[in-house]
């Protein structure tokens, strides 16, 4: 599933073609994805200008001049890609639509934005912009890890007395929004903390050290265009390449990359998900 860096990468890639631009026509090619599309979705999108775009957790939000906000979740295999030149040249150079191209946005600058989702775990909805943050999917989210509300005192407070493993705590979207399995594994490695350790038993100094480490891991991944393991593509169709720099994720049995450590990467299962870590240098 695309995590925060992948969704941020896609959103940034869509902005030049969509932000400030009118959706000339929206084509919806099936009745649903994870859940049914909103009523009259084509009518409510066509002719509307995208005022601004932003990301919240793993959701892309596009505010429209109608007072509604388009919410998009990529699910497990969803992609949003741009074809055509948004400056107006080669506006007919669009590839033929594919089987799983479920929603197509024809922008009035000549760009075409296509939502492709083979597994159909993605989702779209239209929300009232003024009340978007109180929507049931967004209201339960914790602070953004790249935002000002994510700070040391927040994490110390969230971990206090918590008996769950730190890996599970960091994946709790009510504590931090947008973190996923890959980047939690990578952040815990950089911090030297075992994913098995109870969150509430980690010293305050080690908890506070996690905040800048989490930020840096996410920033590094965004700079690399995200991680492409199976389905993920950037908005221009290119692969991300942060996966080539993973320290632990997907490296079971391989040597630890920490200087001076002679351990190997271990994989365990926690809450149904694989955790990768070095048992020698992560404590």
UniProtKB/Swiss-Prot annotation:
GO terms for molecular function: 8-oxo-7,8-dihydroguanine DNA N-glycosylase activity; class I DNA-(apurinic or apyrimidinic site) endonuclease activity; damaged DNA binding; zinc ion binding. The keyword Amino-acid biosynthesis does not apply. GO terms for biological process: base-excision repair. Its EC number is 3.2.2.23, 4.2.99.18. DNA binds at residues 100, 119, 162. The active site is at 2 (schiff-base intermediate with dna), 3 (proton donor), 58 (proton donor), 273 (proton donor). Keywords: DNA damage, DNA repair, DNA-binding, Glycosidase, Hydrolase, Lyase, Metal-binding, Multifunctional enzyme, Zinc, Zinc-finger. A zinc finger (FPG-type) spans 247-283. CDD domains: EcFpg-like_N. InterPro entries: DNA_glyclase/AP_lyase_DNA-bd, Formamido-pyr_DNA_Glyclase, FPG_cat, MutM-like_N-ter, Ribosomal_uS13-like_H2TH, Znf_DNA_glyclase/AP_lyase. Binds 1 zinc ion per subunit. Monomer. Involved in base excision repair of DNA damaged by oxidation or by mutagenic agents. Acts as a DNA glycosylase that recognizes and removes damaged bases. Has a preference for oxidized purines, such as 7,8-dihydro-8-oxoguanine (8-oxoG). Has AP (apurinic/apyrimidinic) lyase activity and introduces nicks in the DNA strand. Cleaves the DNA backbone by beta-delta elimination to generate a single-strand break at the site of the removed base with both 3'- and 5'-phosphates. This is Formamidopyrimidine-DNA glycosylase. It comes from Ruegeria sp. (strain TM1040). The gene is mutM.
């Amino acid at each position: 599933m695309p995590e925060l860096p992948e969704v941020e990468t896609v959103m940034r890639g869509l902005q030049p073609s969509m932000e400030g631009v009118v959706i000339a026509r929206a084509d919806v090619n099936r009745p649903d994805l994870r859940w049914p599309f909103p009523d009259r979705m084509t009518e409510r999108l066509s002719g509307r200008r995208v005022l601004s775009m932003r990301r919240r957790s793993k959701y892309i939000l596009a505010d429209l001049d109608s007072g509604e906000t388009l919410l998009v979740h990529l699910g497990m295999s969803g992609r949003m890609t741009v074809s055509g030149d948004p400056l107006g040249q080669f506006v007919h150079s669009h590839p033929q639509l594919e089987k799983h191209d479920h929603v197509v946005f024809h922008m009035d600058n000549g760009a075409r934005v296509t939502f492709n989702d083979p597994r159909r775990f993605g989702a779209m909805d239209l929300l009232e912009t003024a009340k978007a943050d109180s929507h049931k999917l967004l209201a339960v989210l914790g602070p953004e890890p790249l935002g000002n509300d994510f700070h040391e005192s927040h994490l110390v407070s969230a971990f206090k007395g918590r008996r769950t493993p730190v890996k599970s705590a960091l994946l709790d979207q009510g504590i931090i929004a947008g973190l996923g399995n890959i980047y939690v594994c990578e952040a815990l490695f950089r911090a030297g903390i075992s994913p098995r350790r109870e969150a509430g038993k980690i010293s305050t100094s080690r908890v506070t050290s996690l905040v800048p480490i989490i930020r840096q891991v996410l920033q590094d991944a965004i700079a690399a265009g995200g991680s492409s393991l199976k389905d993920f593509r950037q908005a221009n169709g290119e692969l991300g390449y942060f996966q080539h720099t993973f320290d632990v994720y997907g490296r079971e049995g391989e040597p630890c990359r920490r200087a001076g450590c002679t351990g190997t990467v271990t994989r365990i299962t926690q809450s149904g998900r694989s955790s990768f870590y070095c048992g020698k240098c992560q404590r």
